[in-house]
């Protein structure tokens, strides 16, 4: 059996290419990214600010939980992973794209106004880049608010208005003075005269800055240098003991460690102090005493089961490990660790160790190969 294979000429190839280009032209150009307050043809309505449909990539960014449901965490310098126990395989959050942060700041400000300016998005304790992106987003939203109060439309700077005013002032100056002057000095003079009232309006319309209340007074920026007083990093894995919330107080004569353990029993706690590593390990187990079957459970935020947390103290001042005391009351486990403030103990004197001389059997045999044995 033979098959016939037709031969293609150059004309046939060119004709096929022209047909493909014609079909692409009928489909139209690819859709360009739309700016806020623009009509999206594939949505059928105008989307302003943060109102995006569920399949939009920015939907989850504006429909999350407000930051009022979150509390602040210490910086990275206060967390460490203890060497003993289990390994910490806590994954870090991925860095967000800077372009997405910039777009979200502008769209959120145009929609919410003052409400969106007061709302802040949560930033997680193990993600420094998210904290930096949040500050950039707040700065962009503040600029958009100022432009909205002044009356300048979005996505348009103040340069076109300044240039138009400078041209009018230049024409008036030419008619009055009737002198040949270059346009550059007039534009510079007009810009300086116009920027002053704009700056005054921005300063007058700028809202007062609110002070951020924080339970960590000296935490202003993350420091790469570890703090001498540290706690173990909170565990997020479900197959390992959970980490209860902890507060550590450093007073003049004692360290006070407070852990939140509601619904627990003091007999289920185990507190161990390791003098060699200056670490205190608190572990135990919390039992579910509600008495309702888990099949009726719909929302769960309470933690039950095994827990574990470690506190690492500085080397100095030293700690009186024999006087450590712990109390459990109202769901709070309070541990007081006293310090040795005035160390009056004298250092022990140096002790020289004498080396004992042991005779060498081989040398003795060489000196006396035939020893005489006495009867």
UniProtKB/Swiss-Prot annotation:
Residues 169-197 have a biased composition (Basic and acidic residues). Keywords: Phosphoprotein, Stress response. Induction: By stress such as heat shock or increased salt concentration. Up-regulated by all stress conditions tested. Also expressed in unstressed cells. Residues 22-48 have a biased composition (Low complexity). The modification Phosphoserine is found at residues 182, 213-215, 223. Pfam families: HSP20. Residues 21-59, 81-127, 154-238, 347-375 are annotated as: Disordered. SUPFAM superfamilies: HSP20-like chaperones. Residues 49-58 have a biased composition (Basic residues). Residues 85-101, 158-168, 357-367 have a biased composition (Acidic residues). One of its GO terms (molecular function) is protein sequestering activity. Transmembrane segments: none annotated. One of its GO terms (biological process) is protein complex oligomerization. One of its GO terms (cellular component) is cytoplasm. Residues 237-356 form the sHSP domain. Belongs to the small heat shock protein (HSP20) family. Present with 1470 molecules/cell in log phase SD medium. Forms oligomeric complexes. Interacts with itself. This is Heat shock protein 42. It comes from Saccharomyces cerevisiae (strain ATCC 204508 / S288c). The lineage of its organism: Eukaryota, Fungi, Dikarya, Ascomycota, Saccharomycotina. The gene is HSP42.
